[in-house]
Amino acid sequence: MSLFNKVTKSFQWGDKTVVMETGEIARQASGAVVVDIDGTVILATVVASKTAKPGQDFFPLTVDYIEKTYAAGKIPGSFFKREAKPSEHETLTSRLIDRPIRPLFPEGFLNEVHVVIHTLSLNPEVDADIAAMIGVSAALSISGIPFSGPIGAARVGYINGQYVLNPGQTARKDSQMDLVVAGTEAAVLMVESEAQQLSEEIMLGGVVFGHEQANIAINAIHELVRDAGKPVWDWQAPAEDEAFVAKVKSLAEEKLRAVYQIRSKQARTQALREANASVMNTLKESGEPFDAGKVNDLLFAIESKIVRSQILSGEPRIDGRDTRTVRPIEIRNSVLPRTHGSALFTRGETQGLVVTTLGTERDAQRIDALAGEYEDRFLFHYNMPPFATGEVGRMGSTKRREIGHGRLAKRALVAVLPTKEEFPYTIRVVSEITESNGSSSMASVCGGCLSMMDAGVPMKAHVAGIAMGLIKEDNRFAVLTDILGDEDHLGDMDFKVAGTTNGITALQMDIKIQGITKEIMQVALAQAKEARMHILGKMQEAMGEAKTEVSQFAPRLTTLKINPEKIRDVIGKGGAVIRGLQEETGTTINIDEDGTITIASTDPEKAEFAKKRIEQITAEVEIGKVYEGPVTKILDFGALINLLPGKDGLLHISQIAHERVEKVTDYLSEGQIVKVKVLETDEKGRVKLSMKALTERPAGMEYSERPPREDRGDRGDRGGERRERSDRGDRGGDRGERAPRFNSEQQQQPRSNEQQPAPVGEQPYAPRDSQE
C-alpha cells in the first residue's frame, strides 16, 4: 500500500494541459498543491496558525514566491552558488499573488498565514506566475482555512486584433498587450497590465476575456476540493459587544465628522489623532477594561462610514472636491543643475522629484533570469522615505511596495520610449517622492515622462497617470478621480490608469469587494480618460516636446558601422587595441557583434578623434592611393612601411628609386617617414608599394635594374617531389663532429669552401650508423 493518498486533476486550458496534484509532497502543510503546465512545475504551500497572536490588530499574510535555478538547469552565479535574496521578479510575483487573495480572508481573521511557492521546473514558454496563482488558490481551497475562494488567473495577449490566452515570451513579442487578471467566479479582483496605447474598449475586453478563461481553472479547483479538501475550520469572527460599540460610537462620531470637514491633510491628521486620543482617555477614565486594538478598529469603521456616506450622498469629498476634479497641478523642469534631466511634479499634496540619467550600453542591467539572460536598457526606481507622509521611520533596503510602484511606472512609460537605433543610451529614472497623499506612483509616471524629455529622450508621446477610487453600497456607487490616501484606505477599489492621448499604456486594478460589474469598470475607465487628458494638457503646457540636445554633462554617443570581420582588429589581442584607444582618447567604446561601434564621451572632440582612429584601423588599403607612413623594418630586399594602424606594406628594393639600389639602408632608415604608392594587393592581402612611382625617371637613364629579389618566405614548388630522408642514399664515411645548428636569431654566415654543396649525383655524407 502506498504511503501517499495522491489526488490528481487535469484540464485542458487553451492549447495547454494543466495537471494539479496533492497528497504526495509537503503533506504537513495546511495545504499543498503541485501544478504542472507543459513542463513548468510549481509547488504551492500554505500554513496558517490556529490562533491569532494576542493584541494582533492586522491580518498577517505573507506570500513568498521563490525561483530555484535548478528549475532551468542552472547553477547560481553568485559567490556562494546558492539562491540569495529575492530578485525583483520574485518580489513582483509575490505581490501579484498576494493582491487577489488578501481580500478573500474574512473580516476579523487575524491568524498568521504564510504562502510559499517554489518553481521546481520551468518551460521558458510557460510563465510560472499564472501556475503559481492557480496553485495557491487550490492550496488555500483544500486547506480548510477560512477563505472565500477559489480564485482563477489568466494572462491575456492581443495579437493581430485577437485576444490570446497565456501567450509565451516568444508570442508576447508580437502582442500589443500583456495583461494578468485574477478573480473569483463572480468578480474580477486584480488586474495588472501594460499595453501599446490601446483603447479603453480593448483593455476592458481583455479583462473580461481573461476572467472568462480564469473560470475554467476555478471549476477544476472545485473538483480537486471535492476529492481532497480538508474540513473547513470551525472559525467564527469574535462576537461584537453591542453596548461597547454603541458607547464608542457615541463618544467618537461627532468628533470624527468634524475632523473630516478639515481640508488640509496635516491638520486633519493631527485632529484625527486628538479625537482618537480623547475617546481612549474617556474610556480609561470610565474604568471599564477594553482592548485598544478593538477600539481602533471601531474608530476606523466609523471614519469609513462617515466618508463613504458623504460621498454617496453627493457631498464634497474629504478635501472639498467633487468626484471628477483633479487636484491643482504644478510642474517645474530642469530643477537640478548638473543632472541630465529633472522635473518636479506636484499634484495637490503629492509630489515627486524625478531625475533621469543617461548612460552607455555598458550601464544596462544584465539580468540572469530563470527563463534566460537579457539586458534592460530602461531602469525605473521609486523611493518614498518616511518624511513624505510626515512620519518617523527607518531608512533601509527597498521595500516590496517601492519595487511594485517602480515597476508600474516603468510599464506606463516603456511603450513610448525610442528604439535603441533612435536613441542608443541606457536610461535610468529615479522618482523621489517628497510628499505623498495618494497616487504617488502616477505622479512618478508624469514626472518620469517630463524628466526624460528634459534629458533629451525623444519620447513618442507624453504619458500621464491617474488613480481612481470607488465607493459602492448596494446599488449606489461613486467613481472618484485622483484619490487621496484616505480615500484609498476607505474605498472599495484602487484603479490606476496611465496612457497618452492615443490610448492606455498601463492599467492596475485592486478591488476589495465582489460585485464590481463591467458597467462600473466602463464608467471608471471613461472618467479616468477625462482626467488623463486634463493632466496631459498641463504637461504639454509645461514642456511641449523633448529637448533636441542631451545635457552637456551627459555622455555624447557617436556611432559608426564597420565590417564585422574587422572587429578583431579594433579589439586587438587580449583587448590591447581597444584598451589603448580608450586610454588614448578618454572615451568609452562598445562594439556589437554586427559591427556597430558606439563611442561615449562628454567631449565631442575626443569622440571624433576616437572615431577617426577606428576608421584608420578598419580602413582598407586602396590600390593607386598615395600613403605617408614610417619605415617599420629594413629587410635585405626592401622595407616595410606602415600605411594604416596595424597595416604594413612591402616596398621592394627595386621600387625605392629609378637607379639601381645596392643597399636599402643607403636610402631608408627605420622610423623615416616616406610617401609611397600602392601598386597592388595579392589574394592574401599583402600590399606592394613603390616610391619611384611618385617620381619621374631622369632623362637619359637606361633601364637596367637588378632582377627582383623576392622574399623567400613562401618558396613555392621547388621542382618535383622532395625525397624522403630514407631515400637519400649512403652518406658514407665518418661525419666527424657535427657543426652546431644555425640559430635563427644570429646572423647567418656565408658558407666556406668545405661547406659548398657537392656536385649533383654525389653524396657528401653517409647515413649515421644506428649502432653508434
UniProtKB/Swiss-Prot annotation:
Domain S1 motif, residue spans: 624-692
Any Pfam family the entry gives: RNase_PH
Keyword Magnesium: yes
Assigned GO CC terms: cytosol
Listed GO MF terms: 3'-5'-RNA exonuclease activity; magnesium ion binding; polyribonucleotide nucleotidyltransferase activity; RNA binding
InterPro entries given in the database record: ExoRNase_PH_dom1 (IPR001247), ExoRNase_PH_dom2 (IPR015847), ExoRNase_PH_dom2_sf (IPR036345), KH_dom (IPR004087), KH_dom_type_1 (IPR004088), KH_dom_type_1_sf (IPR036612), NA-bd_OB-fold (IPR012340), PNPase (IPR012162)
GO BP annotations, alphabetical order: mRNA catabolic process; RNA processing
Biased composition (Basic and acidic residues): 703-740
Positions with a binding annotation for Mg(2+): D488, D494
Assigned EC number: 2.7.7.8
Compositionally biased residues, Low complexity: 743-757
Main localisation: cytoplasm
Reactions catalysed according to its record: RNA(n+1) + phosphate = RNA(n) + a ribonucleoside 5'-diphosphate
SUPFAM superfamilies reported in the protein's UniProt record: Eukaryotic type KH-domain (KH-domain type I) (SSF54791), Nucleic acid-binding proteins (SSF50249), Ribonuclease PH domain 2-like (SSF55666), Ribosomal protein S5 domain 2-like (SSF54211)
Keyword Transferase tagged: yes
Cofactor (UniProt): Mg(2+)
Localisation per UniProt entry: Cytoplasm
S-S bridge residues: none
Keywords linked to the UniProt accession: Cytoplasm, Magnesium, Metal-binding, Nucleotidyltransferase, RNA-binding, Transferase
Top-level EC class: transferase
Region of interest: Disordered: 690-772
Start and end residues of each KH domain: 555-614
Protein task: Involved in mRNA degradation. Catalyzes the phosphorolysis of single-stranded polyribonucleotides processively in the 3'- to 5'-direction.
Protein family membership: Belongs to the polyribonucleotide nucleotidyltransferase family.
PANTHER family given in the database record: POLYRIBONUCLEOTIDE NUCLEOTIDYLTRANSFERASE, POLYRIBONUCLEOTIDE NUCLEOTIDYLTRANSFERASE 1, MITOCHONDRIAL
Protein's name in the database: Polyribonucleotide nucleotidyltransferase
